[in-house]
Amino acid sequence: MFAIISAGIAPGIALLSYFYLKDQYDNEPVHMVLRSFFLGVVLVFPIMFIQYVLEKENVGGGSFFVSFLSSGFLEESLKWFILMISVYPHAHFDEHYDGIVYGASVSLGFATLENILYLIGHGVEHAFVRALLPVSCHALIGVIMGFYLGKARFSADKARVKWLTLSLVVPSLLHGSYDFILTALSNWIYYMLPFMVFLWWFGLRKAKKARSVNMMQV
């Protein structure tokens, strides 16, 4: 059990540390980052319950509905809601890159508990693939959500609406695409590899842009 928990936690902590330490000028308070991570952990339970009810009540159906609505939109909208009520209005959210840190924190909290539960059910031998695919996917989608929230936080009213909309729509579409590739396509690995390369490129590009804004503010 210790090996499973360690393998389940390690990729999330490693990715969170990476994005946290990239904030070179004004690191966020550790307690705020840990709180966001913990809120992501707690979020697993209501999402599991809602998905269970949707499945039992036969709401929707087919890979598209499950991927883009029951999984993608549901999970990302609740992460977005957590960020909006616990982080977005907070005084510590005072730089564009802060959105990256908090977005990654909530997403990786969710991904870490989900990863542990999966490894308990399927075995620690899946840990490496889990780290490369779902945990990384959650982290990068959280980064992208946080990027757009950072844009919204420091924009005028009209632009703010656009960035807030993108902060929910883009992560939901990316998450839905990941799930659809994984569950609906045969030979999914051939589609997943370029998708993950794109996701890493897109996420790291957004993180770099946010850091450059921070540098101009110093």
Curated annotation (Swiss-Prot):
Establish whether keyword Transmembrane is in the entry: yes
Please report a single Pfam family linked to this protein.
Answer: PrsW-protease
- Keyword terms, alphabetized: Cell membrane, Hydrolase, Membrane, Protease, Transducer, Transmembrane, Transmembrane helix
**Ranges of the Cytoplasmic topological domain:** 24-30, 122-129, 204-218
| Outcome recorded upon mutating E95K | Constitutively active; causes constitutive activation of SigW
What does the record list as GO biological process? proteolysis; signal transduction
Q: Where found?
A: Cell membrane
Q: What class of enzyme is it?
A: hydrolase
- Any idea what a deletion of this gene does? Loss of expression of the SigW regulon.
**Chain ranges on the Extracellular side, renumbered to this chain:** 54-98, 152-180
Q: Does the keyword Aminoacyl-tRNA synthetase apply?
A: no
Where are the residues marked Involved in sensing cell envelope stress as a site? Answer: D23, E28, E95
Please report the record's description of how this protein sits within the membrane.
Multi-pass membrane protein
Q: Which domain of life is it from?
A: Bacteria
Q: Which InterPro entries match?
A: Peptidase_PrsW_arch/bac, PrsW
For this chain, one GO molecular function annotation is:
peptidase activity
Transmembrane domains' residue ranges: 1-23, 31-53, 99-121, 130-151, 181-203
Reported EC number(s) for this entry are 3.4.-.-
Please give the GO cellular component terms listed in this UniProt entry: plasma membrane
Protein role? Involved in the degradation of anti-sigma-W factor RsiW. Responsible for Site-1 cleavage of the RsiW anti-sigma factor. This results, after two other proteolytic steps catalyzed by the RasP and ClpXP proteases, in the release of SigW and the transcription activation of the genes under the control of the sigma-W factor. Seems to be responsible for sensing antimicrobial peptides that damage the cell membrane and other agents that cause cell envelope stress. Therefore it is a protease governing regulated intramembrane proteolysis and resistance to antimicrobial peptides in B.subtilis.
Return the similarity comment.
Belongs to the protease PrsW family.
Question: What is the official name of this protein in its record?
Answer: Protease PrsW
Record organism: Bacillus subtilis (strain 168)
What gene is it encoded by? prsW
